[in-house]
């Protein structure tokens, strides 16, 4: 009984609901953060949301979008701190956390996409992950990053073209 009550109180105080936490985890994982560091990344997002409230700032209009952008920024910070090659295997493992029965083709495609993401510039990778993996609309991405919508669209276009070229170059698709 006490555990249920404690859990309920904890859930009420948690600035992120379960769906937002899953989205943050996905953005971090797709941004290259290793599985072992995902809980720390989620805690960082929670902490930043609580710090924002403690400083008297209004809550973000869309907490889910705000949290996804913060998670994306954390992933970019992590990228700057580590060499990309060291974490490629960990990243693929985190993407396969919820494995579906699949063939060798899917594994090859996953590896090629991960390598393609690694080769993109940080800003292009960020908007690509936020748009297609966090499922944020262009307008939300632009607002959260503080850039014009046209800039987001341009980065998306360039990133998709580069990723598509990489996949065709490797004869994956």
Summary of predicted features, one role per range:
Residues 1-29, 35-42, 50-53:
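A short, charge-rich alpha-helical start-of-domain segment used by transcription regulators
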Residues 40-47, 51, 61-73:
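Structural recognition of an alpha-helix C-terminal capping motif at a helix-to-coil junction
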Residues 118, 122, 126, 134-151:
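Helix-turn-helix DNA-binding module
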Residues 55, 69-90, 99, 106, ...:
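Arg/Lys-rich amphipathic alpha helix in sigma70-family domain 2
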Residues 28-30, 34, 112-121:
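Short amphipathic alpha-helical boundary/capping segments
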Residues 82, 93-118:
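Acidic, proline/glycine-rich intrinsically disordered inter-domain spacer in sigma factors
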Residues 72, 76, 139, 145-170:
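DNA-recognition helix of helix-turn-helix
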Residues 20-21, 31, 129-137:
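Short helix-capping/turn signature of helix-turn-helix
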């Amino acid at each position: 009984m006490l555990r249920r009550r404690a859990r309920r109180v904890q859930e009420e105080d948690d600035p992120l609901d379960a769906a937002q936490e899953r989205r943050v985890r996905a953005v971090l994982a797709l941004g290259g953060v290793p599985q072992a560091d995902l809980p720390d990344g989620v805690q960082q997002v929670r902490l930043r949301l609580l710090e924002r409230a403690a400083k008297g700032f209004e809550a973000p209009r869309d907490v889910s979008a705000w949290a996804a952008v913060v998670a994306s920024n954390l992933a970019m910070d992590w990228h700057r701190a580590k060499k990309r090659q060291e974490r490629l295997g960990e990243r693929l493992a985190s993407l396969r956390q919820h494995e579906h029965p699949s063939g060798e083709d899917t594994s090859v495609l996953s590896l090629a996409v991960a390598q393609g993401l690694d080769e993109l510039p940080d800003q292009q990778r960020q908007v690509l992950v936020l748009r297609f993996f966090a499922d944020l609309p262009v307008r939300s991405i632009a607002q959260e990053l503080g850039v014009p919508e046209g800039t987001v669209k341009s980065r998306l276009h360039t990133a998709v073209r580069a990723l598509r070229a990489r996949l065709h170059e490797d004869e994956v698709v």
